[in-house]
Curated annotation (Swiss-Prot):
The lineage of its organism: Eukaryota, Sar, Alveolata, Apicomplexa, Aconoidasida. This is Ferredoxin--NADP reductase, apicoplast. It catalyses: 2 reduced [2Fe-2S]-[ferredoxin] + NADP(+) + H(+) = 2 oxidized [2Fe-2S]-[ferredoxin] + NADPH. May play a role in the terminal step of the DOXP/MEP pathway for isoprenoid precursor biosynthesis. Its main location: plastid. Its cofactor is FAD.
Amino acid sequence: MKIRFVFILSVLISGVCCISKNVSRRVANRMTAHSRFLFVHDKYKRNKNFKLKNNKEENNFINLYTVKNPLKCKIVDKINLVRPNSPNEVYHLEINHNGLFKYLEGHTCGIIPYYNELDNNPNNQINKDHNIINTTNHTNHNNIALSHIKKQRCARLYSISSSNNMENLSVAIKIHKYEQTENAPNITNYGYCSGFIKNLKINDDIYLTGAHGYFNLPNDAIQKNTNFIFIATGTGISPYISFLKKLFAYDKNNLYNRNSNYTGYITIYYGVYNEDSILYLNELEYFQKMYPNNINIHYVFSYKQNSDATSFYVQDEIYKRKTEFLNLFNNYKCELYICGHKSIRYKVMDILKSHDQFDEKKKKRVHVEVY
């Protein structure tokens, strides 16, 4: 009898201990998960800079379309944005999305190249490097190698240059290319999306993801007449074209009507290789002509060299105008935007930090999107 009692008691105690351990384990797991959530959430908040990102409308636009569920659109126009003496090849694409692609100025869209080819070409074979090779037609009509089309679908992101009140969406895309080595000297290879973009024609289908990013204007920029400094290299000018169209209520059907109440001051530092490489030149000249008291543009050409034969870049121009630049940022309370090659970020931040009063409050006025 005693043995049976001891056995039952031991079973009960072990059960309680087991339950206690399970409860403790579940509590610990919840605490760990909660801590992880807080860490990620806090990091996410810091990355997003919620000063500008608390717009509910904007949050509804983010990732509305994904790689698994993209939006099928049509190319309605394709324009070469550079002139003959530019070493680059850059296209402006105008895309009809039937009003379905929602975005704010400063957002990016993703383009999925070869969307149909990845599924519908029976001659595609996968090699060991997980690239797709077309066994019947290794190059397309423009002699562009297809060996770099990736098996796994992914999108390349491009800044939107149109305003969200316009019928069509537009982007500027630089074509990246490089020559094949001695094995195939007559073949030019293109970047993952570049070959696809180069071959696009009007009325072709194109698949978009997005909208993406948080490189946007303050919600109250027009009401408060916020001053701005825009720094760009190459295609980094695209979001600023979008910003200008928003701030000045641009209407391509009524170009000479001033419909905006915005009276702030905008300084643009734009670095490109030479004069023929300026993107959206017509738009920039239009805004400067229409609003001469509101816009000042500094073009910086890298083909011009310093005395030591090194190239002169946009960050060098800003350093040369350091006093003027810091005066705009500190005394005119400008919101500073940096978009383009990642090298410009460090030099500009060094200039800002050289001022004794560059604190966390001012840091919140700096917005960066580099590549």
